[in-house]
């Protein structure tokens, strides 16, 4: 149950009722009532500017309108202790904080379900993310996209959306031919035969490893077979090796997928031809200079796009169009693609394609993931010390731990550049945000263990009104009560970093409370029981928040 959210809605409704009772405007003229938390505590718990909004319609000074609303406002119905009119016409509400005590039993009863809502109303949403070519290791951009995509998927599901997490396997096209040719070269080299890598080949250590494995497993068997047969086998072998590695890395990073969708299946099922036929029937295909073009300018793209080149090969765009048509045919009403910053220019043509297929282009949303810069000892890390090549996702996980990587990558909007301080990420100090948040969970877990040793329990008949006696307790209760609204907002605005910020704020409120108040006081058993219920609610809420961003909640540190 969302106690704070319900109270806010009741407060808004009472404001609407007061406007009506004061005869200021007709109900249909009343704008949305907005509540804000004032920056300064002296200005109350909530404030509204409704009087300023109504001034033009009611043809009265905002302050006079505010005073009329206050006169008709029934404070007792909504736990308001005091109301003030401030400045040009702000109405400030000072709450009777006893209503906040209901937050604690609501959390204890809900447990892992605390924070859930139905703002998504079961809407079918597909989140497609990572989708790295199966031709090498996952790099830092993939890792950040994985963290953002998975956190967003978790948050959407928590908010009542029907979420499918999908990885698009680019297992067709020239890059896969180059993979097969690269494996072939490394295979022959492993057998002692000199064969150069193709011009656009893959030079990673993983390709060397595949070549060695093939040589160990099959000896010179593939030296004597037809090249086409050899490359077909190497293609499948290389793909399976690379994809298994990607799957293992993502599993270690706590990122699950519901669907692994093969690009090759689009060719085999005829879905590419279907998409092309749909565009042709709708009048958005034409032939020019021996190529087949998509008239994307009809939908605001800056130029038309080639789908089939003069040599008969497909551009990347055509299978992508077929893939998005298939997504929409599967019943998803919202397609959220998590793409690297280099794909920014691709968005208008994909939206144009969706519109040309007869769907709402707004069904497609793209979350852009910007670059990650690693820093260690105050200097930028450009290459791995171990391999001399770009740092991989696996290396970063091993260096600083999954929790730190997941937290840091979910700490900022994906569309902002991120400087990742590796020294800070492993520091056991309050300057390290993931340590600070996890330590809050370990701290409340320790308190609950100590209580058990003293045979003290938060269960049973506990007077929770003890929890509104100090400012630190009230701040903690307010923070706990905000969680469902934070999750709902993070889902609707596609902002997983809001949950990360919330976890930090809740941890801060807990540490502040702990430093100011004595939780286990054997001379005040009733107050102690109430505070134990409070810290148990903090434990549950921290666990739930951290779970959404893929970070563990340790009981000891």
Curated annotation (Swiss-Prot):
Motif ('HIGH' region): 132-142
Catalytic activity entry: tRNA(Arg) + L-arginine + ATP = L-arginyl-tRNA(Arg) + AMP + diphosphate
EC number: 6.1.1.19
Pfam families assigned to the protein according to its UniProt record, in alphabetical order: Arg_tRNA_synt_N, DALR_1, tRNA-synt_1d
Gene Ontology biological process terms from the UniProt entry: arginyl-tRNA aminoacylation
Transmembrane helix found in the keyword field: no
Any Gene Ontology CC annotation: cytoplasm
Disulphides: none
GO molecular function, one term: ATP binding
Subcellular location as annotated: Cytoplasm
The entry's keywords: Aminoacyl-tRNA synthetase, ATP-binding, Cytoplasm, Ligase, Nucleotide-binding, Protein biosynthesis
Family note: Belongs to the class-I aminoacyl-tRNA synthetase family.
Self-association and partners: Monomer.
Designated name of the protein: Arginine--tRNA ligase
Protein's organism: Geobacillus thermodenitrificans (strain NG80-2)
